[in-house]
Amino acid sequence: MFPILRPLAIVAATAAASPAFASIPFFNATCPMNIEVHADQGGPIYINGKQAKLKVFNAKAYEATHNHVTISVTVNPDGTPLVSYTARGGANGICMVK
């Protein structure tokens, strides 16, 4: 890619992703296997106190990954989050939002 186009592409991609990132609701959740999840309004998402890598699918669906744990967050039409997890060894389930 031309040197001048690379920064422009990065800025465009960031600008497009920012509105979706902003719709993450504030929540705390507890999952089996002693997994604690916290999200600030607009992000980021923390798994057991560590900031997770966030993947945005759309304005209502996200995945946060840290240390072999993936947290899936879907935002319901009323704004409440539905949180589930997948961990090493195929462990998975629904998390309790507090």
Each predicted region: which residue ranges?
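Classic N-terminal secretory signal peptides
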Residues: M1-A22
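Cysteine-centric segments in proteins
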Residues: A22-K98
